[in-house]
Amino acid sequence: MAASPHTISSRLLTGSVGGCIWYLERRAIQGLPHRVTRLFRNVSNQWVTLQHLSFLKRMYVTQLHRGLSQRVKPKPEPPASPFLEHTSSGQARADEDELPSFPAPSRPLSRKPNEELVELEATSIVDHSLDTAKEKKEERQWKEMKLHTDDLPGILARLSKIKLTALVVSTTSAGFALAPGPFDWSCFLLTSLGTGLASCAANSINQFFEVPFDSNMNRTKNRPLVRGQISPLLAVSFATCCAVPGVALLTWGVNPLTGALGVFNIFLYTCCYTPLKRVSITNTWVGAVVGAIPPVMGWTAATGSLDAGALLLGGILYSWQFPHFNALSWGLREDYSRGGYCMMSVTHPALCRRVALRHCLALIALSTAAPVLDITTWVFPVISLPINLYISYLGFRFYVDADRRSSRKLFFCSLWHLPLLLLLMLTCKQRPGQEGDKGEAPS
């Protein structure tokens, strides 16, 4: 039976299509080696990556030969989309020529799940990123600090807390000037110099002991010992070179009583106050005693005795430090807590505010006691009452509000309150021959 023309044309078309498909498959099989490039990644010692240039498919095979030890450091390039990346046949051949040829593995492809393979690759990338970050951190951490001779005076000034030392010397000078008797300039200079050296020594030893804790606080993390600008040996040597001549000047240049007070204050600050800061809130009261001794030293340097006037000056400095320091520590509670210090503002905030207010009011009573002890005239408690009432008002606001704003106001008020109060005391100082006329202002 003869086939119809339609059947003959269908068979011819089917044969032509089949021949074309066979020809294309043969060309694809012959060109496959030119489209495959072996790319090695530092994923594992037992895996090799094969990347198909047409579809960017990654396959993993088991490494059989120990000679395949080539490692290429991965470059931090963002991965390109497989649907947007097109590689020409010429570039493929060039990449194939650059890479060495390796024998094909004899074992079949691994049949591990794709999730495990992706996890291996991701783990290698994360490990490499962590290693790079660790190297950069170590480079910053172990950066060499060079000490120049020109920078040494400034470093030693920060080591000795030069501003705090200046405050100590000024209160000592006020105690010397308020003491009865003639003003001896040579004794005054020796007292100021000896007290300043003793203060530098105490502050340097304090920083030496607190290096591990200061590094955790934003307020103290840039101190010289914390940053490694000077060695601990140099800091201790500087403290010794300040303490020995300072105590010698106070003992033999002034009088033994003043020298003994200087030694006691260094011991109290370095061996009692410094370790107590991490143990108990009583460190604040001990620190207030340390700050109250310098005006007493100035009084004993001028008179050679420890009488009621010296104790009154010490009491004024003692009470002034509580609103000053409690207001300061209130704004640094996070820092003190991070550094491991036991402060009233951290552990007993209500007591911190109550003590500050209590000693603000005590300044009024101590100012009233000054003319009773023949240190000043009766004009002093009158003219000092406004500033004492003002700091008491700020202390009350700090007690009621218990916020950072009120503590800052109280702290900045204390900065100008003390020098103004001492200046008023010097202005109203009791002169010889005025004991019977205490109500008149000095001429």
From Swiss-Prot:
Keyword Lipid metabolism attached: yes
Swiss-Prot/TrEMBL GO biological process terms: aerobic respiration; copper ion homeostasis; cytochrome complex assembly; heme A biosynthetic process; heme O biosynthetic process; leukocyte differentiation; lipid metabolic process; mitochondrial fission
PROSITE patterns attached to this UniProt entry: UBIA
Transmembrane spans: 174-194, 230-250, 252-272, 286-306, 308-328, 363-383, 410-430
Chain intervals for the UniProt region annotation (Disordered): 68-113
Top-rank taxon: Eukaryota
A Pfam family: UbiA
Membrane topology: Multi-pass membrane protein
GO cellular component: cytochrome complex; cytosol; mitochondrial matrix; mitochondrial membrane; mitochondrion; nucleolus
InterPro entries: Protohaem_IX_farnesylTrfase (IPR006369), Protohaem_IX_farnesylTrfase_mt (IPR016315), UbiA_prenyltransferase (IPR000537), UbiA_prenylTrfase_CS (IPR030470), UbiA_sf (IPR044878)
PANTHER family for the chain: PROTOHEME IX FARNESYLTRANSFERASE, MITOCHONDRIAL
Entry protein name: Protoheme IX farnesyltransferase, mitochondrial
Organism, as annotated: Mus musculus
Encoding gene, per UniProt annotation: Cox10
